[in-house]
Amino acid sequence: MNGKRPADPGPARPMKKGKKQVSAEFSDAVTEEILRKQVAEAWSCRTPFSHEAIALDMDPFLHCVIPNFIQSQDFLEGLHKELLSLDFHEKYNDLYKFQQSDDLKNRKEPHISALRKLMFEDFRAWLSKVSGIDLEPTIDMSCAKYEFTDALLCHDDELEGRRIAFILYLVPSWDRDLGGTLDLYDTDEHLQPKQIVKSLIPSWNKLVFFEVSPVSFHQVSEVLSEETSRLSISGWFYGPSLTRPPTYFEPPIPRNPHIPQDHEILYEWINPAYLEMDYQMQIQEEFEERSEILLKEFLKPEKFAEVCEALEKGDVEWKSHGPPNKRFYEKAEENNLPDVLKECMGLFRSEALFLLLSNLTGLKLHFLAPSEDDETEEKGEGETASAAAGTEEGTSRRPSGPENNQVAAGSHSQENGEQADPEAQEEEAKKESSVPMCQGELRRWKTGHYTLVHDNTKTEFALDLFLYCGCEGWEPEYGGFTSYIAKGEDEELLIVNPENNSLALVYRDRETLRFVKHINHRSLEQSKAFPSRSGFWDFAFIYYE
């Protein structure tokens, strides 16, 4: 475009001359017409193609590598220097942690400007011919810097109009042990990611680009180097949008009403302090104000020790739980659990615990728990806020009256146990719209595990319960904490850190989402202080009124 315009008089002439001196060209081998046609033919036929200057592969989805993209090393050094002088901003949420520059669209630095022209004029024209896609001149390019423990978890890059993603690496000597690889996932019959089948190692002046599609799932693995940064320029070429397949919805997790259970289970398992009427009233008041509470030393010490011993013995059958664009952790197979762990799972599903939780939180989780019609004059109306204390959004609720706390320890649970049939309860609870239900699992958390917020996350009113085991020496900087955020926002409302024998209760509304932050390699420090530890466990349950 500049070549078609007459030179401006005055000081503009040296500037244009300067720009001509800083120019970028990509590999002559790639621009050869014969090679370009061969790559275009392979792209069109969806067949692999390999040449010393360029490699195209279809497994697990279409991607291409040009090992020496820019011709001039002097240009690359100048570009590298300009990039490091930029202001970087920390990017942090459930999906990623790294540093990113401002958009490079309007930067005036000579090397950055020259690269931008190369990518979105010369290379875009070449890529349009190769791919057969009418790529638009839209500029979308930024610089990313990944340092120790930074990562970008599994995602597909799909956004309206994105057709081809690219990454130009400007890293020093690099190998797989340093992490930071571009990992590519294969997919199942539902077009959901399964496992990593290919990893591309960054190297100086390597360009990787791939077709953005419903199956282009990839991640940047955690950077493991404490000395070296992983610097890259990345962006997208835009064009006509592809038609997306119908959204896949996972089968819903079964929910069940409480299990009829003698109230003695509470006295057998739970710290007696939490069965005291006055203390329950105090807890309920705090919970209704904050919508969250952490109850320390929740289980009796001897019971907690039995649970930890069973978990440490290794007799539990663990199964990896995905898909990785939504979650990655291990879940216990309940059919083969040791007896004490089965009993603990039964505790959290028991009628007695439903009633105890009703009295600790003021929620209607049992037909004996007071409803709004039973509201007492002493207590009046109470507010249940959203997940974080101090937020103004929330749902108005009515707490239990003090006179109802005599059932806190489940003293009336047994005599009503026979009425716990789901159908009977449903009839009883029509005015409440549903029978109280729960779902739960026993999870193991290790380095690399996480959960993500995703587009199909169902948001509803619910009480989250977590009981943590094996957290000795666990630090917040390791990750593994549960973070609550408002829908559409990255700012954290509440963080629940794993803590031994602590029961976390959090009430969330329809505008509140949660995730477990990626557990990074700093977590390996735990095993140095506690050799028998390589992560932690939690009993995770959700209760619905």
Curated annotation (Swiss-Prot):
Cellular component, GO, one term: cytoplasmic stress granule
Family matches, as Gene3D superfamilies: q2cbj1_9rhob like domain
Record-annotated Fe2OG dioxygenase domain positions: 137-239
GO terms, molecular function: iron ion binding; L-ascorbic acid binding; peptidyl-proline 3-dioxygenase activity; peptidyl-proline dioxygenase activity
Positions contributing to 2-oxoglutarate binding: Y169, R230
Subcellular location: Cytoplasm; Nucleus
EC number: 1.14.11.-
Keywords tagged on the record: Cytoplasm, Dioxygenase, Iron, Metal-binding, Nucleus, Oxidoreductase, Vitamin C
Annotated Polar residues bias: 402-417
Ranges of Low complexity composition bias in the record: 383-393
Record bears the keyword Cytoplasm: yes
Subunit structure: Monomer.
Protein task: Prolyl 3-hydroxylase that catalyzes 3-hydroxylation of 'Pro-62' of small ribosomal subunit uS12 (RPS23), thereby regulating protein translation termination efficiency. Involved in stress granule formation.
Name the UniProt record assigns to this protein: Prolyl 3-hydroxylase OGFOD1
